[in-house]
Amino acid sequence: MQYQLLINGALVNGEGERQSVYNPATGEVILEIAEASPKQVDAAVLAADNAFTAWGQTTPKVRAECLLELADSIKQNALQLAKLESQNCGKPLHCVINDEIPAIIDVFRFFAGAARCLNGLAAGEYLEGYTSMIRRDPVGVVASIAPWNYPLMMAAWKLAPALAAGNCVVIKPSEITPLTALKLAALAKDIFPPGVINVLFGRGQTVGDALTGHEKVRMVSLTGSIATGEHILRHTAPAIKRTHMELGGKAPVIVFNDADLDAVAQGIRTFGFYNAGQDCTAACRIYAQRGIYDTLVEKLGQAVSSLKMGAPEDESTELGPLSSQAHLARVTAAVEEAKALSHIRVIAGGRQTGGKGYYFAPTLLADAKQEDAIVQREVFGPVVSITAFDDEEQVLRWANESRYGLASSVWTQDVGRAHRLSARLQYGCTWVNTHFMLVSEMPHGGQKQSGYGKDMSLYGLEDYTLVRHIMIKH
């Protein structure tokens, strides 16, 4: 099993404190890995800074070829990567193989193509005797912090646009789920020039702070919690570093009386519980119009109760464990707080399953009120709440009364209503009669406390560039 760090083109052992990496399906230790030492963090950033001189000047064709080669290598090693991701995260293996690995490969391939299509604006004479040009140039060294819910996919989302734009990257995966990022380091080692990609391991307070605060780091990209985002913004503020933040969500799912309720129930069964609900776009905050509320609660209860929990390697498993013992405790506390409210009805789940591993039963909580914490705070687990609403204006107000602004969906057969709400919902993405669908060509990112900046799409590529004006006198 690959457990070494990638620094300046070489795989090396960490020199810091050893940390245990767990299998969440069993609670057992997979292995121990040594963190990067402060000296190794410094070496990785300096390697990236040195490599940037040449990499930032390479042609888009060369960068694209490297990204395509890495995509091919991921495809060739797909089963090994999927098994590592499943073992370290508790994801059902078939979901990683069939859903996540193809999407990861596509992200690298998309940005390989996009790298060759990034242009500045046309030249022009805006002052007599002078010609102006607009360039889009790479930022420099990017420190990327990836989360524990989709370790390999988020590594791809961080690496691909940054590298395509000509930046060099030092990436730190979560210390909870580092195995696929470390394997990716081994695959990338002989494809990219030394220092272009560096992969470290360690906790935020020991490695993350040293990395994001390093004077040579020009940009920090984070996918994580609001609290982590706030910390990094405070930590990097004195140096005025560029930042790119994706900080979670609490997606409203608005279901009107005319919606196809069978499609809604089956959709939420998937969109609310994929990856054990550990997804910032999960369909977790349901608003159902009063005329269909009771029917939808019944249909959702049946759908949620039918989800099969089990071992990640079992092909029939739909729901795996949560990522860690600490996160299991957080999800349990959030549900217990909701259950203590007299108006909340537990339709399904609402408890840990017991036994080995960090499993929490798929949960549906009915009759939640707008002010309840279960409606307002991200749980990040297999937990969905449902609230009744009366009319369009009320539900629009409730949906937007949230500190989050990442994803939302509207379920209706009324095209005019779909357009009206889509235009007024304060979310980075709004789906109509579906949820959770992502493609490499379209941007993903939030507003409000869900952060700023885009992943994927040409907008994501532009976020890793600087706009520069060149003026020539003639």
UniProtKB/Swiss-Prot annotation:
Record carries keyword rRNA-binding: no
Protein name: Gamma-aminobutyraldehyde dehydrogenase
Note: 4-aminobutanal can spontaneously cyclize to 1-pyrroline, and 5-aminopentanal to 1-piperideine.
EC category name: oxidoreductase
Keyword terms, alphabetized: NAD, Oxidoreductase
A single GO BP: L-lysine catabolic process
Superkingdom to which the source organism belongs: Bacteria
Listed transmembrane segments: none
SUPFAM superfamilies: ALDH-like (SSF53720)
Enzyme Commission number(s): 1.2.1.19, 1.2.1.-
Subunit structure as annotated in this protein's UniProt entry: Homotetramer.
Pathway the protein acts in: Amine and polyamine degradation; putrescine degradation; 4-aminobutanoate from 4-aminobutanal: step 1/1; Amino-acid degradation
GO molecular function: aminobutyraldehyde dehydrogenase (NAD+) activity; NAD binding
Function: Catalyzes the oxidation 4-aminobutanal (gamma-aminobutyraldehyde) to 4-aminobutanoate (gamma-aminobutyrate or GABA). This is the second step in one of two pathways for putrescine degradation, where putrescine is converted into 4-aminobutanoate via 4-aminobutanal. Also functions as a 5-aminopentanal dehydrogenase in a a L-lysine degradation pathway to succinate that proceeds via cadaverine, glutarate and L-2-hydroxyglutarate.
Record family assignment: Belongs to the aldehyde dehydrogenase family. Gamma-aminobutyraldehyde dehydrogenase subfamily.
Active site: E246, C280
Coiled coil: none
Leader sequence segment: none
NCBIfam families associated with the record: ABALDH, PRK13473.1
InterPro entries (UniProt xref): Ald_DH/histidinol_DH (IPR016161), Ald_DH_C (IPR016163), Ald_DH_CS_GLU (IPR029510), Ald_DH_N (IPR016162), Aldehyde_DH_dom (IPR015590), Aminobutyraldehyde_DH (IPR015657), PatD (IPR017749)
Binding site residues for NAD(+): A146, P147, W148, K172, P173, S174, E175, D209, S225, I226, A227, T228, C280
Recorded catalytic activity of this chain's protein: 4-aminobutanal + NAD(+) + H2O = 4-aminobutanoate + NADH + 2 H(+); 5-aminopentanal + NAD(+) + H2O = 5-aminopentanoate + NADH + 2 H(+)
